[in-house]
């Protein structure tokens, strides 16, 4: 069993996911963590006599080895690492919803302070791709920014939604690190500098990411799921009723391979094998785990796994020795093995008994329905599945439909469907009443997003009187654009919005792509020439037209810019296109974006006016306070009372102004998110280098406040020369 080598109990609360460790003087490892009231504490047990007198840092009145850093804002993320290689020691990075502070603890000074309009929800420090200096990369309101040690903005790009987690990892094995981004839209995106090279869709918000080794990384979701990916392939995942607060890679059993360490909301800490997800170590805190880090905290040459709880308890664990042979739990390996083998034995005996009973029944009498209760069904029984589109009626919305049927008179007693991102809890059970049993049933399916999904089916087949059933297991893939029904081009008007591009492919290959990605009726016959198909969205009734000329020119008409982006990305992936330039026009969406940009300007103006008013009021308060105190010292109580009444009124004005500032800031963030998403959508309409050029040019246009240029870039993909 693995026991902690040290335990500390600090009298400071620790905010969840806000723990970092660093050598802030180049020698001694110190813990930094966000605590209450907009402060960060630094625990330094190595130099207890050191006292700070800077304006930001002051000694904690509760503990001599804890110093407090005043941020005066709610801390939203915390990180540490070497930002300036010339200094030779770590820098503390503190992110809030409006700013990023790089603090030099050793010299008690700001390395830099930057206002970030998109906020900082997550932070990671390191080198990215070919960008030479180390960067402090923050993820905020649909945007990613990277700053060097001078605060220069060397990296910027947009992503699909609010960022919740970041990690650096050599994803493609080229010796250079890529940026992993987890966001609110359930996606894990991999950025090679500003280019997205891979996307993995999960089932909930991605709250944590951590590199393990090579291209392998761990992840955690807001629904209690943790798991491990190797590139785009998921190795394993488990789901708990508790929430994963922090994950970290650490070799806890000294086998040369990092395990995934998870700190949970119920106080449990466990280590799982990177290959199987098997628990090889666990411990419990009395409160939720706030963070998991590693460092040589005792300065004895051995790195410890350091776990912190929200109540301020800190425990350090040394990796297990070779003599422990990986046995880090209370129970012995032999006991676990015996228990596992006993369980397998019981399962096999039960299965053997069922086979013996079925064999006896077959020998004693011919097959009839009465024997069905013993679980006997004809040997040639087959299970058929079919996917189709149901346009719905007055009682039911339009949806995709999974049809399941047997090949004879056997009935389907129940169906279990496992699918990510479609059903609540990722599973769905269809269990008809005894009066409605038949050899076929239909299951409505409504995918919320346009992504391909594997449906794993377990179907219980038998007779009405059966007490035992045969279980048929099969997997069926739901095409990416399942929620679009093929309709006649003459049935509705063609959308005004469009994208236009050219590919060096035959129309026959386009038909193949169509069959793979849409649910087409069996009797449909899509012509190669002219290639012209029309679909209706089952979600909102919107129209989608896809046309292709013999020359390879493709036009997609739809008013949904997200759908157009998905279509282009799917076609580019199918035809293995690396670079694709696209001409696009979405008049309605662009007009909405123009209104948003006008609002952003208005909110910025209001923000500046409110800031100026607040500065004026602050000066007036200072003056009134001095006059009031002068009157008190001169025993002029009437004047003193008058001055304090004025101060009271001014204070009320300041509070009202603060509320207006808060509301203004919230509205501004919402509109900035819409702008960043618009740039992301414009980028998704292109592939490869044209995509990166569009995102970069759009940002330059917004910086220079050139709205007309911005819309031209979004339409044609390049800035005017």
UniProtKB/Swiss-Prot annotation:
The keyword Cell membrane applies. It is found in: Cell projection, Cilium membrane; Cytoplasm; Cytoplasm, Cytoskeleton, Microtubule organizing center, Centrosome, Centriolar satellite. One of its GO terms (cellular component) is stereocilium. Residues 325-369 form a coiled coil. One of its GO terms (biological process) is leptin-mediated signaling pathway. Disruption phenotype: In mice obesity is associated with hyperleptinemia and resistance to the anorectic and weight-reducing effects of leptinan mice are resistant to the metabolic actions of leptin. GO terms for molecular function: RNA polymerase II-specific DNA-binding transcription factor binding. Keywords: Cell membrane, Cell projection, Cilium, Cilium biogenesis/degradation, Coiled coil, Cytoplasm, Cytoskeleton, Membrane, Protein transport, Transport. Its main location: membrane. SUPFAM superfamilies: WD40 repeat-like. Part of BBSome complex, that contains BBS1, BBS2, BBS4, BBS5, BBS7, BBS8/TTC8, BBS9 and BBIP10. Interacts (via C-terminus) with BBS7. Interacts (via coiled coil domain) with MKKS. Interacts with CCDC28B. Interacts with DLEC1. The BBSome complex is thought to function as a coat complex required for sorting of specific membrane proteins to the primary cilia. The BBSome complex is required for ciliogenesis but is dispensable for centriolar satellite function. This ciliogenic function is mediated in part by the Rab8 GDP/GTP exchange factor, which localizes to the basal body and contacts the BBSome. Rab8(GTP) enters the primary cilium and promotes extension of the ciliary membrane. This is BBSome complex member BBS2. It comes from Mus musculus (Mouse).
């Amino acid at each position: 069993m693995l026991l902690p080598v040290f335990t500390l109990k600090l009298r400071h609360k620790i905010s969840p996911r806000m723990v970092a460790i660093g050598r802030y003087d180049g020698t001694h490892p110190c813990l930094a963590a966000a605590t209450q009231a907009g402060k960060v504490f630094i625990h330094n047990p190595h130099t207890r006599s050191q006292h700070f007198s800077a304006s930001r840092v002051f000694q904690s009145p509760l503990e001599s080895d804890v110093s407090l850093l005043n941020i005066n804002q709610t801390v939203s993320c915390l990180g540490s690492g070497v930002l300036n290689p010339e200094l030779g020691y770590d820098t503390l990075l503190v992110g809030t919803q409006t700013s990023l502070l790089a603090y030099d603890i050793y010299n008690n000074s700001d390395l830099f302070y930057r206002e970030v309009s998109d906020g900082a929800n997550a932070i990671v420090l390191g080198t990215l791709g070919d960008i030479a200096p180390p960067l402090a990369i923050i993820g905020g309101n649909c945007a990613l920014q990277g700053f060097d040690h001078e605060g220069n903005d060397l990296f910027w790009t947009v992503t699909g939604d609010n960022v919740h987690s970041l990690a650096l990892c050599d994803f493609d094995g080229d010796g250079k690190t890529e940026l992993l981004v987890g966001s609110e839209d359930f996606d894990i995106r991999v950025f090679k500098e500003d280019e997205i090279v891979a996307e993995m869709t999960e089932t909930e918000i991605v709250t944590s990411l951590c590199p393990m080794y090579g291209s392998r990384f761990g992840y955690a979701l807001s629904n209690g799921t943790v798991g491990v990916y190797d590139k785009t392939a998921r190795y394993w995942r488990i789901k708990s009723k508790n929430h994963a607060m922090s994950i970290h890679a650490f070799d806890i059993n000294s086998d040369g391979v990092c395990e995934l360490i998870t700190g949970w909301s119920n106080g449990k800490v466990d280590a799982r094998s990177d290959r199987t997800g098997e628990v090889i170590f666990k411990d419990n805190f009395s409160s939720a785990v706030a963070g998991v880090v590693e460092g040589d905290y005792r300065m004895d040459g051995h790195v410890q796994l350091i776990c912190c709880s929200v109540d301020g308890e800190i425990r350090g664990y040394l990796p297990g020795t070779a003599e422990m042979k990986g046995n880090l739990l209370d129970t012995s390996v032999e006991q676990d093995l015996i228990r596992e083998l006993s369980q397998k034995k019981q399962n096999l005996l039960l299965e053997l008994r069922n086979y013996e009973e079925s064999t006896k029944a077959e020998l004693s009498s011919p097959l009839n329905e009465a024997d069905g209760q013993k679980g006997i069904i004809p040997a040639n029984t087959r299970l058929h599945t079919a996917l189709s589109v149901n346009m719905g009626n007055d009682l039911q919305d339009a949806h995709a439909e999974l049809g399941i049927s047997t090949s004879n008179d056997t009935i389907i007693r129940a169906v279990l469907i496992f699918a990510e991102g479609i059903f609540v809890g990722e599973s769905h059970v269809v269990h008809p009443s005894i009066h409605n049993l038949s050899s076929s049933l239909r299951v409505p399916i409504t995918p919320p997003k346009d992504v391909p999904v594997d449906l794993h089916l377990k179907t219980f087949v038998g007779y009405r009187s059966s007490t035992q059933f045969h279980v048929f297991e099969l997997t069926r893939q739901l095409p990416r654009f399942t929620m679009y029904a093929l309709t006649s081009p003459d049935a509705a008007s063609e959308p005004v919005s469009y994208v236009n591009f050219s590919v060096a492919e035959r129309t026959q290959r386009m038909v193949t792509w169509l069959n793979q990605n849409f649910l087409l009726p069996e009797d449909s016959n899509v012509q190669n020439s002219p290639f012209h198909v029309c679909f209706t969205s089952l979600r909102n009734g919107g129209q989608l037209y896809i046309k292709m000329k013999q020359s390879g020119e493709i036009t997609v008409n739809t008013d949904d810019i997200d759908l157009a982006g998905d279509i282009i990305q799917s076609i580019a992936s199918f035809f293995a296109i690396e670079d694709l330039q696209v001409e696009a026009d979405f008049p309605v969406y662009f007009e909405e974006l123009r209104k948003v940009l006008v609002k952003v300007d208005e909110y910025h103006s209001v923000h500046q006016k409110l800031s100026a008013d607040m500065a004026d009021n602050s000066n007036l308060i200072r003056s009134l306070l001095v006059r009031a105190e002068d009157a008190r010292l001169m025993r002029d109580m009437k004047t003193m009372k008058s001055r304090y009444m004025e101060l009271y009124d001014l204070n009320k004005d300041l509070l009202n102004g603060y509320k207006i500032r808060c509301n203004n800031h919230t509205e501004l963030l919402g509109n900035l998110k819409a702008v960043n998403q618009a740039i992301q959508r414009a980028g998704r309409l292109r592939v490869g280098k044209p995509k990166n050029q569009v995102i970069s040019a759009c940002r330059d246009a917004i910086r220079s406040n050139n709205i007309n240029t911005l819309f031209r870039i979004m339409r044609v993909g390049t800035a005017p020369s």
